[in-house]
């Protein structure tokens, strides 16, 4: 019994054959082989044939080694429980419900079950592979995890965050690029390299439309004193019209202030050419407006009138101080000397009494530079009458504008209703109100431009006839061409102011 117990503990192969993994002759017929006799290989080699105890000498048994190595993987990721689905079949709805139990991983699990059952004998299989040769570590597997599936492996991986150009200059959106670059006292939402430019905002606010012309308010003083008058920005005039030399400046500069260069040289020839061109364009505009006086033409006509008035005001502010013989700065000082010269020339009945200190004195006989200075220039009287002619034609355009508004908002040929209120829209009433204020404002500015420099411009525009003293010398000329021309102009002004006042009252009664 004791020998049988010891023999059971011995290995069937000798140590030399076991280390070389050769089939030992002792294992062929272990019951016949004597443990004391050496095997044929050890006998030929002339070495002692040593047989060690089973499990005590050499490496541990295969079953124990494989069980310890496979147990963590078997508990963490059971590969045989989930079939490797194809991603294409999943998307198309054709999923195979069969589980491949005949996979290599399933065979390995069955072998582990047989070894763990403790049969005590090595089961021989037809496959030459052993469990140790079939097993490979997880990091060295040539095939991916079966859970991913073969179809999912072929799908390219596209990350959500694509590659960005980090060197590109992107806007900071009011966030400074580096907090260390910010000086002390600067808030976080204020970028250091950004500055506010008011001119950029002006380009967005300056919208030129028919109903959005920048005109003075209704309760604004139309004839405020010098330097404090309201300023407007006239709209763009018709592009088919040609402008004179002042067109290079912005149109708002014409109405901005009453200041001008006192030392600017006056040329009657240049002024006559400007007035002649302006007179021709006003005549063409009036002919076009009379051909079709439709209500929708009032906005375009008003644009043209604004441009014409600006040019006439510019020319008048350059020529009137030269005609009167004084500037804005010296107007008060020349009042007394002008009055004495007017009394001395009153008996002669000369028309030059109003211009005693002007350049008209150079035209008198005996003047040192009279004939030589005026031989190559246009007479200044022609410039004066052209000023009046252009002003009269602009009054005519004012009349056409108010007639268009009257035809649009009032009943033609019928008196204005006393109790019944008319109706209108916001756009039409706003356009009409802006047009009325534009006409009255331009009329007051023309009066101030044509008035003598020393006269006070604080009177009302409807009753302002003091500008005529620059042309008639303070005396009302009832006879003659000039007196009749002034009478006609006065009638036009009075009719225009009555019509605009009546039209404003009608618009105020309208309800939306």
Curated annotation (Swiss-Prot):
Write out the annotated subcellular location: Nucleus
InterPro entries in the record: Carb_Metab_Trans_Reg (IPR050797), Zn2-C6_fun-type_DNA-bd_sf (IPR036864), Zn2Cys6_DnaBD (IPR001138)
Q: Give the signal peptide as a residue range, or say none if absent.
A: none
- Stated name of the protein: Ascofuranone/ascochlorin biosynthesis clusters transcription regulator
Gene Ontology molecular function: any one: DNA binding
Q: How is it used?
A: Ascofuranone is a specific inhibitor of trypanosome alternative oxidase (TAO), and quickly kills African trypanosomes in vitro and cures infected mice. As an essential factor for trypanosome survival, TAO is a promising drug target due to the absence of alternative oxidases in the mammalian host.
One GO BP annotation of this record: nitrogen catabolite activation of transcription from RNA polymerase II promoter
The induction field says: Expression is induced on AF medium.
Per UniProt, which keywords does this protein have?
Answer: DNA-binding, Metal-binding, Nucleus, Transcription, Transcription regulation, Zinc
Stretches with biased composition (Basic residues): 56-70
Which Cys-Cys disulfides exist here?
none
**Function, as annotated:** Transcription factor that regulates the expression of the asc-1 and asc-2 gene clusters that mediate the biosynthesis of both ascochlorin and ascofuranone, a strong inhibitor of cyanide-insensitive alternative oxidases and a promising drug candidate against African trypanosomiasis. Binds the 5'-CGGYGNNTTW-3' motif within promoters of the target genes.
Q: Which PANTHER family match?
A: GLUCOSE TRANSPORT TRANSCRIPTION REGULATOR RGT1-RELATED-RELATED, TRANSCRIPTIONAL ACTIVATOR PROTEIN DAL81
Upper lineage ranks? Eukaryota, Fungi, Dikarya, Ascomycota, Pezizomycotina
This protein's GO CC annotations? nucleus
The record ties this protein, via Gene3D superfamilies, to:
Zn(2)-C6 fungal-type DNA-binding domain
Q: Which residues bind DNA?
A: 14-49
Q: Where is this region: Disordered?
A: 54-87, 118-148, 325-351
Where in the sequence does UniProt note compositional bias of the Low complexity kind? 118-127, 327-342
Stored PROSITE patterns: ZN2_CY6_FUNGAL_2
Q: Which domain of life is it from?
A: Eukaryota
